[in-house]
Amino acid sequence: MKKILFVAFAFAAIAVSAAVSEKVVLWRNGDNGIKSFRIPALCTAPNGDLVVACDARKNNAGDLNVFQPINITLRRSTDGGKTWTKPENSWTWTWNDKEKWSGSDPSFIVDEKAKKIFLFYNVWKWEDTKTWDNNVYRFYVQESSDNGKTWSKPRDISADISFPE
């Protein structure tokens, strides 16, 4: 009996490890003109879909304090990670001669009761490209009520989570 159980568990372990060992590349540095993808976050949506986000760093792997456009890019899987939607930005931050914004460091919270996914991240608005002194570091949230298919506009929550000045 012990041998039968051992063999059954061994086959189960092999089957599980084979199922999870398939490699899927979600982002590759250089894709779509993006030099670096960093800081992934993953969650399971209320319906069981997988949602993943990461930084799409246009020019290099540098952080928010490195002068460059950074967006949060998302993908979704409805089959346990075997296939994924095309990458799309949760929001495309403005980067032009008048305004320069970057978003970075995504994280998720899933509210099972409300059936919502919340996507949190940092945002940097560049006011002065030579020093850090005049630049503004903010915290934003977006939410999805349809398991990550669509997202609300970004909402600045900095005042809600910061100490009063």
PLM region spans:
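Asp-box/BNR beta-propeller blade signature and adjacent active/binding-site loops
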Residues: A19-E165
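Sec-dependent N-terminal signal peptides
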Residues: I4-I14
